[in-house]
From Swiss-Prot:
Keywords: Ribonucleoprotein, Ribosomal protein, RNA-binding, rRNA-binding. One of two assembly initiator proteins, it binds directly to the 5'-end of the 23S rRNA, where it nucleates assembly of the 50S subunit. One of the proteins that surrounds the polypeptide exit tunnel on the outside of the subunit. InterPro entries: KOW (IPR005824), Rib_uL2_dom2 (IPR014722), Ribosomal_uL24 (IPR003256), Ribosomal_uL24_CS (IPR005825), Ribosomal_uL24_KOW (IPR041988), Translation_prot_SH3-like_sf (IPR008991). One of its GO terms (biological process) is translation. The keyword Ribonucleoprotein applies. It holds the Pfam family ribosomal_L24. Part of the 50S ribosomal subunit. One of its GO terms (cellular component) is ribosome. SMART domains: KOW. This is Large ribosomal subunit protein uL24.
């Protein structure tokens, strides 16, 4: 199955505490989760690791968000959009369903 959301796509969050925020997908996991730049920031308590020269303390980092909770952002319409697939010149391409433009 082809992925509707891929790395480096600009997405908008549909639900949750970050609803309405936009960001770029940095990583896509096979279990249906994505990491989005600047979205779903959590605070982790990390222990110091003297052997690696790592200081401990509170570290803010991005957590994964369910792929169903984000939608690809269409810059032409300035809205969230759905993704479709079609074949052009023998290649499978993704397109925005609202204006049939290739992503």
């Amino acid at each position: 199955m082809a992925a509707k959301i891929r790395q480096n796509d600009e997405v908008i969050v549909l639900t949750g505490k970050d609803k309405g925020k936009r960001g770029k997908v940095t990583k896509v996991l096979p279990n249906g989760k994505v990491f989005v730049e600047g979205i779903n920031i959590i605070t982790k308590h990390e222990k110091p690791v003297p052997a690696l020269g790592k200081a401990g303390g509170l570290v803010k980092k991005e957590a994964a968000i369910e792929a169903s909770n984000v939608a690809i952002f269409n810059p032409k319409t300035n809205k969230a959009d759905r993704v479709g697939f079609r074949f052009e010149d023998g290649k499978k391409v993704r397109f925005f369903k609202s204006n049939n433009e290739i992503i």
